[in-house]
């Protein structure tokens, strides 16, 4: 009988969380080739096989092995034996075990048994490279699937890299390759640290005539609190023209739990907005609104080794909305209960996200409010809007598709929507006008219980289009068309005399990114529908400037 020898060896590449927008960060896995033996049987000669015998397996349940190999009892030639070994190899890969080799060793003629040898590669060495601000312990904590003496499971490693690469300050890849001895696997974790610019300033004209056209925000971010990859963010926003009328403060904390393939997110938000004084025959009228919110959300990364990724989320918020009105000498009494009201909300949100980097994203979220507190009754909600239900439910949808039409042109489609079966208070209604929805109109100029906005945008870099050297001085040009629609329950108007309203716009935009520190976006949109003070044919310029340092 001839000695066993490998007939071929191949390197298998597996998608992972290391996939970036450029698709350069793939997890390369030396899964091992299918090795077969050159036997004494001539090509085309079959021998009877009554059963399979597999040695070396500790990872797959016996039921999975039996299912992969099928039922024996037929004559098999060498290609059929190779196919059986390949089926078992595929079963390991399907279960996420990449560093496993199935061997077809030398067989004993006349035994009527097909012997298969499994070699489960185990990690013998773990190296890291590229990290400077992050410690080696930090990097290794983010990939607990890599443990000395254990076979790495690609399904787990894939999700760990996905979670690790949500950190804004680093990007990790893993390379698995054969070690010095048979069955050894050496792991190399390479880290690409991104520029650390903790401070960010945003300036945009997303305000209102009443509170000031401009909004100025300052943000601080720490991407590695306590060397545990916890990301802390703090943000404050106001109106530089009328700072006493707008104050928004928020804070977020994201905690990755790599072993559980889960991220926990916490958020705090406090806002206060005051309108200008309106003079009436009964005296000066002033409106003010404020909100408080605290929430937590858990995100589970679902297993999978394809290019598409998916996750589940479960969140719970505690919210308080308050509206105040004063009129003349009586103050709040002059506005009555409809002008002064408070609502407590405890919305529970369950979401599912499916996405492929640089290709598409789909998010579906179901929200159900749990009434709580002294202002969580139907009567409290009715004080804000007659007929509003404190046990409201929502179904939200967000989708995005990116496609490259040519080396120079890219097409992007976006959809954001909400469906509500009952009337909602103002704070929970959807807005479909403004810089992030339907451009060409004031922010939230059109709101409703249910609604959707969509956008189709064609973009290209001007320097590549004109065959010029790539430079930050050249902008990315975009041509877009936006549209939106809202509807209200109980006949509530979104425009005078209408409970269902539509709007649309079209325009052109330009954006610059300078040294990955300064970002400027300009959109000029022409309104196609009259909404409030915006007439059909009016043009509006949306500006956004960001500086990081």
PLM region descriptions:
Residues 243-352:
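Transmembrane beta-barrel wall of Gram-negative outer-membrane proteins
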Residues 172, 197-199, 226-232, 259-266, ...:
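Repeated loop/turn-to-beta-strand initiation elements of outer-membrane beta-barrel proteins
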Residues 191, 222-224, 255-257, 300-302, ...:
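Residue-level signature of outer-membrane beta-barrel architecture
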């Amino acid at each position: 009988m001839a000695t066993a020898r490998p007939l071929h060896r191949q390197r298998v590449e597996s998608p992972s969380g290391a996939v970036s927008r450029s698709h350069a960060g793939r997890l390369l896995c030396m899964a091992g080739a299918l090795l077969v033996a050159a036997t004494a049987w001539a090509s085309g000669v079959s021998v009877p096989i009554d059963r399979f015998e597999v040695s070396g397996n500790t990872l797959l349940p016996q039921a999975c092995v039996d299912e992969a190999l099928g039922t024996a009892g037929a004559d098999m030639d060498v290609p059929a034996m190779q196919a059986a070994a390949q089926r078992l190899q595929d079963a390991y890969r399907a279960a996420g075990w990449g560093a496993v080799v199935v061997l077809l060793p030398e067989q004993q003629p006349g035994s009527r048994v097909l012997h298969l040898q499994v070699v489960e590669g185990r990690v013998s060495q773990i190296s890291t490279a590229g990290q400077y601000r992050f410690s080696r312990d930090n990097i290794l904590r983010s990939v607990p699937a890599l443990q000395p003496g254990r076979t790495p499971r690609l399904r787990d490693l894939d999700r760990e890299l996905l979670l690790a690469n949500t950190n804004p300050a680093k990007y990790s890849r893993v390379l698995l390759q054969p070690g010095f001895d048979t069955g050894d696997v050496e792991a190399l974790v390479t880290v690409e640290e991104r520029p650390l610019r903790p401070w960010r300033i945003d300036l945009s004209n997303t305000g209102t005539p009443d509170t000031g056209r401009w909004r100025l925000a300052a943000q601080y971010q720490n991407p590695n609190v306590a060397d545990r990859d916890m990301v802390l963010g703090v943000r404050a926003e106001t109106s530089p023209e009328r700072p006493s009328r707008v104050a928004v403060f928020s804070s977020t904390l994201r905690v990755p739990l790599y072993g559980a393939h889960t991220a926990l997110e916490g958020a705090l938000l406090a806002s206060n907005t005051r309108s200008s004084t309106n003079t009436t025959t009964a005296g000066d009228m002033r409106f003010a609104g404020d909100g408080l919110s605290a929430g937590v959300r858990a995100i589970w990364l679902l297993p999978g080794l394809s290019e598409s990724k998916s996750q589940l989320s479960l969140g719970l918020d505690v919210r308080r909305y308050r509206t105040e009105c004063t009129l003349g000498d009586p103050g709040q009494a002059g506005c009555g209960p409809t002008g002064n009201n408070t609502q407590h909300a405890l919305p529970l949100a369950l979401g599912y996200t499916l996405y492929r980097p640089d290709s598409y994203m789909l998010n579906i979220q179901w929200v159900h409010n749990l009434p709580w507190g002294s202002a969580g009754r139907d009567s409290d909600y009715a004080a804000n809007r007659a007929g509003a239900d404190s046990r409201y439910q929502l179904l939200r949808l967000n989708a995005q598709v990116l496609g490259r039409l040519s080396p120079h042109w890219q097409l992007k489609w976006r959809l954001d929507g909400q469906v509500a079966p009952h009337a909602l208070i103002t704070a929970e209604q959807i807005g479909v006008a403004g810089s992030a929805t339907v451009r060409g109109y004031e922010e939230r100029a059109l709101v409703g219980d249910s609604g959707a906005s969509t956008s189709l945008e064609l973009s290209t870099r001007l320097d590549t289009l004109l065959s010029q050297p790539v430079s930050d001085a050249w902008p990315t040009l975009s041509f877009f068309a936006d549209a939106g629609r809202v509807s209200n329950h109980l006949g509530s108007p979104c425009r005078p005399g209408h409970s269902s309203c539509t709007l649309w716009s079209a325009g052109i935009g330009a954006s610059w990114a300078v040294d990955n520190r300064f970002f400027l976006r300009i959109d000029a949109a022409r309104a196609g529908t009259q909404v409030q003070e915006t007439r059909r044919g009016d043009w509006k310029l949306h500006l956004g400037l960001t500086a990081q340092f």
